[in-house]
Each structure stands twice: as structure tokens, then as C-alpha cells.
Amino acid sequence: MVDALERFRKILGADWVFTGDKVASYRDPYTIPNDAERFQARAAVAPASTEEVQAIVKVANEYRVPLWTVSRGKNFAYGGAAPVLSGSVVLDLSRMNRILEVNEKFGYALVEPGVSYFDLYRYIQERGLKLWLDVPDPGWGSVVGNALDHGVGYTPYGDHFGMQCGMEVVLANGEVVRTGMGAMPNNNTWQLFKYGFGPYVDGIFSQSNFGIVTKMGIWLMSEPAGYRPYLITFPREEDIEQVVEIVRPLRLNNVLQNAATIRSLVLDAALFTTKSQFYPHAGPIPDSVAKQIMADQEIGMWNFCGALYGPPAITDVLWTATRDAFASIPGVKFYFPEDRKRRPDILIHRADTMKGIPKLTEFGFLNWNGGGGHVGFSPVSPITGQDAIKQWRMVSGRVREHGFDYMGLMAVGFRELHHVTVIVYDQNDPQERQKLDELFRLLVREAAAEGYGEYRTHINYMDTIAGTYGWNDSSLMKMHETIKDALDPNGILSPGKSGIWPRHLRAGRKS
């Protein structure tokens, strides 16, 4: 490793090779459980170009040095910049932060991995371009990294990987490939048409360790002729069944235009308040306190945030259909921003997010009960009321049994619900971290037993989640391993990412 680090310094300069105390920022910000030896980087390197990435990869191959790639390292609740395999060198792409092109006519951007949502938003605003981003909740993350990890947002362009078009990838041998139309010299549709000619390979570079994405095209939304965000609140937890049954036909028929979310009481309240304001005790809040929070914050046990996009002639019709569909639920309330007088307010916050304005407001929930740690449990289900209430009962029951408040949302996709439960815990309390670990593993087992799979997870659980996708004697993982061995025979790229290990590290792996 010493010789490899010296070679890295010759490539990048000593200022961009980090060792010793300088590696501290590449640790998991929320270590789970209490084990200081896990997920520890030996060093980190920060290239500034594709050519420098190529050179680093070639040296890593020569010395068999494992590289853990991060775009900006802001994937908090999923491990941050920490590697699965301790002793890895973090390949930090945050210096590769060029916005190479933003095309207003065709609605796309071509960016490097270090470009954040704040960066791209600022670029568009400074130039007065009539384009909107789609952003996840924390805007400090990488546009490329979030798409590769199957992140989601809240406009009609909410499927971030679905909106990527054309990649540049450095393979494990240092070779550079461009996918789709980018494989043709002098082609001018690289960011316009995904597929090119032959197999579509972009997908194998998402949530994987088969290559290092150094450029990506991302589609941007043209600024609509009108925008109307709204909030619909529901007074009972059991309402989630009827709410989701109403949502499905509205979504399938594009009456609901965006990736709307159905958010729980505590998740929304926690953005702007703390638990101690209502219940200065340990354990989950009782029903009486939940009702107090509802009245104080003017929200429901479930809160549906959505938006309408387009000229009034269109949005008026869509709103009438939406309002009439939900009006059948007893106690339902409808709001537009002008109806919300208190500040700060959940609809005012979400109104920005649903028009692509990056923020960090969502991190407010970390102050709910102190300690600042959180992890996301994210099983996927069909858009049915039966599945929604089944998942809610299963997850919220276990969360409360373990002494935590249920903080969840159901994000409405094109055909599916992402049920994202945020478990907030005291990262400084070893017992609470252990309790969190036990809860998470129980949730994974019980969800898998019901056929619900997670779509992303913390590095601590990648092997565990990968193991739940075991149909036909784990034939999918066997295919992943075959691809891994072919593209990365020395196993240097992000060992253990998504449970995919190189041949020499596979034996004896357990979740």
C-alpha cells in the first residue's frame, strides 16, 4: 500500500492523497452498530479528471489496492463516504465538478460526479434558463451519484436514474467507454437517446462496482406554464389504505403528475419541532400527544403533498379530479400555500422541493429526539391499499416496539410505492445503536417473508439485502458475480457494493 500511495501522489500531487487523520471525513457519519473497526478507509485520493481516474485505476490494479468510489460522499443514512471493505482507498470524485453543458432547447445537462444539486441549480438560475431540476430531499448530494443509487425526487422527473441519458465510464482496466449514442464519434444525440445500438448497458453501472462513471447526461424539465402545489391531510393512521387506493388510478392516468408523497405525522412535525416540545419522555409518543401535534402543526396523521404543472386550463381540471377523489375520506382537508399561515410550514417547504429547488431543510428531523443518527428502511410495494396498510402496520409496529417513533413516507412511483421509514436514533448511545441494528435486521427478514424488497440500503446491510434477492438459487447474484469477474478480475472496484464481491473475497461471506 505504501508504494501505491506514493504512485498516487505522483499522479495527483501530495495535496490530493489523504492519509492518517485526514481520512476521518470518509467515515460513516452514523456508525451501526458500535464497531469502530468496520468501514474504515486506509486512505483517500481525489482526482480532477477522467485521465487521472484512469491512472489511479491502473496503479490500483498493479498493487491490488481496493478503491471505494464516491461522487461527493453525501449519501448519509446509507454509509456516507465509508467503504464496505475496511482498508480500501476512497476514490473521491468531488473535485470533478464541471458542468459541461446545459442545453435549454432539448432540456438536458452533462455533468461530472462532483456536481451537486445546488451547483446545477445555481448555474441554471444565474443564466436565466427556463429549466427545472428534480431534487432529492438534501440538495448537497451529487446529481450523478444520486441517479446511480436510484434516488428519487418530487417533480414529474422524479425517477432520477430513469432521467439519465448517456454515460462515460472508466472500467477496471483503465479503459474509457461511452454508452448509448456516445459510442459513435461526432454523434450529437448522446444526451437525447438512451439506447444507441446493441445491448443497453447503462443499468449495470448503477448500484454496482463494475465501473466508475465520470460523466452523465441528465434530463431536465422545461419550466411549466403554471405550478400549483397542494397539501391534503388525513386524520387517521388507518386512512392510508383508502388514500393509496385512491392514488393508484389517479397516478396511472397521469392525473397525479409528479412523484407525490404520503408522509406520516411525526416525519412532517419533526422538520420544525422537537419531541421534547410535546413529550419530554423516552419511547414513542402516545396517541394523545399525536393528536396534540396534529392540532398544533395543522397537519394530519398522513399528509399528501402533490403539485400540478401546466397552464390553468389543465391544472384546474386535474385539481377538480384530485379533490373529488379524496373528498370521500372523512375528515380530509385541502390546502394551497396561501391557506397556510404559520411559518415554517410543511407545504411551503415541499412547494420548493416539488419545483426543483434544492434545500437542506429535511435534515430538521434529526433534531426530533437528539443524537443525530438515522438510517432508512425502504421496501417497495405495489400501489394498493392492502399493501400500504400491511407495510405500515408491520413496520410501525416493530419500530414502536423498539422504542422509536414511526417516521415514514410512501413515495408514489409510476407503478409502485417506495415506503421509506426513517429511524432516528442517538448515535452516541451504544445500546441504542445496537437496538437499531436488531430492529433493522428484523424488518428486513419480515419484509422479505412477505415479498417486499428494499431498493437501497446502508453499507452495513448490503450483504443482507442482496441475500433476500435469492430466487432460483440466487441466479441474479451469480450473474452479477460473472460480470464482476469479467470486467474487474482483480476485484479492485468497490468490493462489497450491493453485496457484489470479487472472487477472492467471496468465500465465507455472510450477511
Task: Please identify what each model-predicted range represents.
Residues 201, 217-218, 228-239, 243-354:
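C-terminal cap/substrate-recognition region of VAO/PCMH-type FAD-linked oxidoreductases
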Residues 7-31:
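Conserved oxyanion/phosphate-binding beta-strand-loop segments in alpha/beta enzyme cores
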Residues 98-102, 111-253, 511:
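FAD-binding subdomain of flavoenzyme oxidoreductases
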Residues 48, 232-238, 306-314, 378-385, ...:
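Short beta-strand-to-loop capping motifs
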Residues 33-43, 55-58, 65-66, 70-72, ...:
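Conserved glycine-rich FAD pyrophosphate-binding loop
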Residues 52-55, 119, 237-244, 312-320, ...:
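Short, conserved charged micro-motifs
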Residues 29-130, 141-152:
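Long, structured ligand/cofactor-binding scaffold of large enzymes
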